[in-house]
Amino acid sequence: MFESLGDRLQNALHKIKGYGKITEDNISDMMREIRLALLEADVNYKVVKEFTNTVKEKALGEEVASSINPGDLFVKIVKDELVELLGGESKPLNLNGNPASLMLVGLQGSGKTTTIAKLANFLRKKLAKKPLLVACDVYRPAAIDQLKQLGKQLNIEVYEEGKNDPVEIAKNAINYAKENKYDYVLIDTAGRLHIDDQLMDELVNIKDTVKPDEILLVIDAMMGQDAINVITGFNDKLPLTGVVLTKLDGDTKGGVALSVRHLTNVPIKFIGVSEKLDGLDFFDPERAAGRILGMGDIVSLVEKATEAIDEKEAEKTAKRMQQGKFDLEDFLSTMKQIKKLGPLENLLKLIPGAKKMGITDVKIDPKQMAHIEAIVLSMTPKERRNPDIIKASRKTRIAAGSGTSVQEVNKLLQQFDQMKKMMKQMTNGNMKLPF
């Protein structure tokens, strides 16, 4: 997310770190680089102009205390203005209805149907509530089939009637949700190839009938600045409460995220970060700005760890590390928990200063992880608890059982030995373990 833009901005800001004073002369080239980076990321020209003017004005007008590095102050100004550009503060969902209703709208191809399933999954996991999906796209049978399939995958009920009146379907779905004690109703409306009066009239009728707590517009981030016109077109007819930006995980410039709030006054509430059904994140401007500038996102990292890692198991492993008893059984357990967190390269990007440490470009081959797991599982419990007993004949057996080579078994044992030594140093130095 925002990787290309982040690289450009970080490179530009790196140049001011050593300056003893901020002057118009020594920041002019850097401001030009920031301007170009934003424009090339497809940020709206008007937004770029206002952003750079504000940053420059604040930087030159700040009284710098002797204890503060001017370069650090400039970076703080840039970050604060980025946060403001992205929406200032995160805007929570209004879920006060009984049941609360959320209406998702958008053009065809924006990822609306997949997004509504992701959102239902998000609400169920994060808030432990019972969601109901509603199929109101009666013009595309494939859309109803897709929603039913997604609902089946997630074990979330999909309400559909097969009628041709989406307003009636939405109304009946609310009554059904009340009768069956559903907490949230998520309405998947019909998409169009472009905004037209027929689409808008239908959406307005659903809105007037259901009176949803949230009306979220799903937008493909790869649309670039055309997305602004789409948001404006919908917002002229419907009181949008938020935007969901999809496909921010792909090779997209992401500039629309920096333009939406400033130009339309509609907040970004969610972003799609992967194609998986758990690939939807609540949008937080402060965290997003930190990630753009390479400051990491520790809060997200902790949240992911809290969701995925078994606390008791982690405490048990930590205790064994501190006692110097960490073995391959513990290693296997730890690896399985780390796998739950998602791709390791994505986690590394959340660590502050990861780019400077050169760890953001690390590529972890899933096949290699599978080989490691197979090797450890091919050992006997005794061998996992006492790796020192694994000699030549045992290595040959383990390699054959795991479909790998003796060289790979040797490599794993060497890496495990290095890891144990490192852990011993950490615990001797009273360093806290990251879980």
PLM regions and their residue ranges:
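Conserved phosphate-handling catalytic cores of large alpha/beta enzymes
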Residues: 170-174, 182, 194, 198-208, ...
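Long amphipathic alpha-helical segments used for membrane anchoring, targeting, substrate engagement
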Residues: 2-19, 189, 287-435
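Residue-level signature of catalytic and energy-coupling elements of molecular machines
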Residues: 16, 42, 78, 107, ...
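Generic secondary-structure signature for well-ordered alpha-helical cores
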Residues: 36-40, 57-60, 83, 87, ...
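Short, glycine/polar-rich helix-capping loops at beta-to-alpha or helix-loop-helix junctions
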Residues: 141-147, 227-230
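Conserved Walker B
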Residues: 138-139, 163, 189-191, 221-222, ...
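Primarily NTPase-proximal linker/entry elements flanking Walker-type ATP/GTP-binding cores
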Residues: 9-136, 143-163, 169-179, 183-189
